[in-house]
Amino acid sequence: MELLISGYGPAGRENLVKCDEHGKVVWADTVESPSFICTAGDRLFAGTENDDYAVFTAYVKDGDGYRKTDSLRFDGVGCLCHVCYSEKHAMLFGACWGSGHLIYATLDKDGKFHHAGKLLQVNETGDDSLITRAHFVHVNQAEDTLMVNNVGLDIIYFYEIADGTVREKDRIYTERGQHPRHSVYNHDESLLYVVTELSNEVLVYAMPEKKLLQRISTLPEGFVGKSHCSAICLSPDEKTIYAANRYSESLVYFRVGADGLLSKVLQEPVEAEKPRHMILTKDGRALVVCYQVAGEIYIKPLGADGLPISGAATHFPFADAACAVDLG
């Protein structure tokens, strides 16, 4: 297993790392507070999360590691927490939780940034108590539509991607206070699964109609208290949805029915503190869980049924663990 892992913290320490499943480092670099990373082909991108500005950093594969090709700073935005890349348009997108901005830039063949832009998702609700907080970006398979989840406004925005910019074309309004954090499509994009940070649910939408089909809790039965649902994954065979809860400190496993609707099959306590991010390996055979507060990466092997194999989890330390990518 080859992983890329990022961890919060100042520049000067190795906080962007390529390693194996035991944490053995193959390559490392230092970037200021790399909150989220993504890859596309031979390219690697990292986003710097700072209260007062954001930075895109681009790399290209070089031997067993990566070589930095460029970085781009955006002023007047804050807390860049998620990035994604469109190969078709050679565009990198980022969601800024602190300021509510969508930021983007195009990339040339040498990995240099140009034609940068930013868009503020304005609070148009009339409720001044709401604060715009863009938190998630995702490009669809056709790479003609960008989805942006705004947890503060309880809106999922859809933008047309064209000519190095974006134009809004549609929205999903979730219920006030749900806070749609992250989303995942099924393979043919006929269903959209949305995990909500504050209501701690998975919402299931029929697409492209954007019709709500189901809402199901991610919390342990009878739980009362603070909880923030943080991550969602769909297995490659589309039979299992995984979600992680912070504060209530649990992982939850849902079986996906033939109709795409969910039923809970397992809830288990986490091994460390506050699972911030979670991915499935590309083969669907393991969960990789980033525990930011605990500073740990846990790898949880899964059985043929998509459920964790008892006693098989392994882990290694990683300071302020924020994000992981499976390189296959």
Residue ranges and their predicted role:
Residues 8-10, 49-51, 97-99, 107, ...:
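Short loop/turn segments immediately following the C-termini of beta-strands
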Residues 23-30, 68-74, 117-128, 167-173, ...:
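A short beta-strand motif characteristic of beta-propeller blades
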Residues 27-89:
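Blade-loop segments of beta-propeller domains
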Residues 31-41, 75-87, 123-143, 174-189, ...:
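Beta-rich, blade/repeat-based domains predominating
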Residues 59-65, 104-114, 159-165, 205-211, ...:
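Short loop/turn segments immediately following beta-strands, especially the blade-tip
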Residues 68-138:
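Asp-box/WD-like beta-propeller blade repeats and closely related beta-sheet repeat scaffolds
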Residues 146-200:
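Loop-centered beta-sheet repeat module
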